[in-house]
Amino acid sequence: MKRPVGLLYSADQVPPPSIVLFSALQHMAAMAVTLVFPIIIAREAGLSAAQQTDVVSLSMLAIGVATILICLRSRFIGSGYLCPAGFTGIYLGPSLFALHLGGLSLVLGMTVVAGLMQFAIAPLLRRLRPLLPPEIAGLVIAIIGLSLAVLGVRYSLGVTESGAIQPAYCAVAGVSLTVMVVLNVWSTGFLKLFCVLIGIATGYAASMLLGLFEVASLAPPEGVGLLHLPDTGHLGWSFDLATLVPFGVAAIAATLRIMGDVSNAQRQDDAEWTRPEFGSITGAVAANGAASAFCGLVGSPGINSYSASVGLAGATGITSRSVGYTAGGIYAALAFVPVAGAAMVSMPAPVIGAVLFFVSAFIFTSGMQMVTARMLDARKSTVIGFSFAMAVMADIYRDVFAAAPELLKPIFDNSLVLGTVCAVLLNLVMRIGVRRRVRLALAAQELEREAVERFLFENGARWAARRDVVSRAVFGVVQVLEVIGTPLG
């Protein structure tokens, strides 16, 4: 393992307490963006303001426990890398479908089922490896980056229902994003480490100046003290086979996403990274499944690794999992502090947009690096290209896909789910006719270098092998043939 240039603290290192704390706060601010998904579910379910506050508090507990589980380093569960958790749009479509079909209890019950499905998939990952190759994981990461960028632009522009853009939102997002980029690119030390946190603070200040944020919004609901045990009276669980397919697809998409995120975390920690280490990935998927089941039990929608935080870790150079433990522990503790929940959900929309847009650049490029590290023939190019195009179309032509059958809407409503499903299915189809073993016969007096190179490179692309591996294979084969036969001409 070789330490990458720009990595300040690796997964196994423990930074000074001050750096751990500020890094954890930075990740917590980024993760707070995902609390919008439980809020959407709570509002769609028609819960009261007090119940919505309880949902946010319970969701903070869930996100804290999930982060600790995924970052944990153990033999059976956890990734061992800084891979914080966050609520995800993957489960939003299936959850809304279940909500309209059977209410909040069906959402929570099927979230538990989806978590158990993901937990059951974990030990089978090695056998499923041919169906989930690294280039597919890279594609999923790239789609996630693109999705975050689209969402970030929407928040930054403050687009209204009529399609109008709000100048104040653009100003706040522009100031916040500029601070993040300038500090990340042209500064060093403390300023570079906490560029996102400083950008967020700047965004809050700009929002207050332009009237987009008021400190009074941080006040807890009337009658609620400083410490408050969330009420669980609104919780219930039910199950319906009609929602099994959408939640199953979401579980598979969540599995691919965390596989990609952990692979990205591994790559950020090792300059000589070549392929995913499946022991770590298996533990991460098991942790994610257990975390999603826990979310369903405490009244939250499904959860997943948070790609933005993985990208944030790479951008700041701090990948220590102790940061994840700290962020998770603080989140779990703040679940019992109502004002903390209000602070998390009151972040101005343009500031959220700036954070999403900033980290999307690192996520997208990481995914594309994983894809382009492999040799791609016509089959693999078709899988990657078609799947990426379908994911883009899901965002551009959302109104068109809204006409899909009700059972398929959870797939077509989400670009990540649609792109993932297309990639997995196309990969299965394109494997037809691909042989695991191939042979090239050469005449003793006609050992041509070009024929050998062409044979190895064509099959390397068919198998999506890394270019450096194929190049070494070509060199080795050529050397052997030069020894046992006529020198290649």
Model regions and ranges:
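Hydrophobic transmembrane alpha-helices of multi-pass solute/ion transporters
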Residues: 1-14, 179-182, 196-248, 403-413
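Bergerat-fold GHKL ATPase/HATPase_c domain
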Residues: 431-475
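Conserved ATP-binding N-box helix of the HATPase_c
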Residues: 467-489
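Membrane-embedded helical hairpins/re-entrant loop segments and their flanking transmembrane helices
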Residues: 8, 15-18, 42-61, 65-78, ...
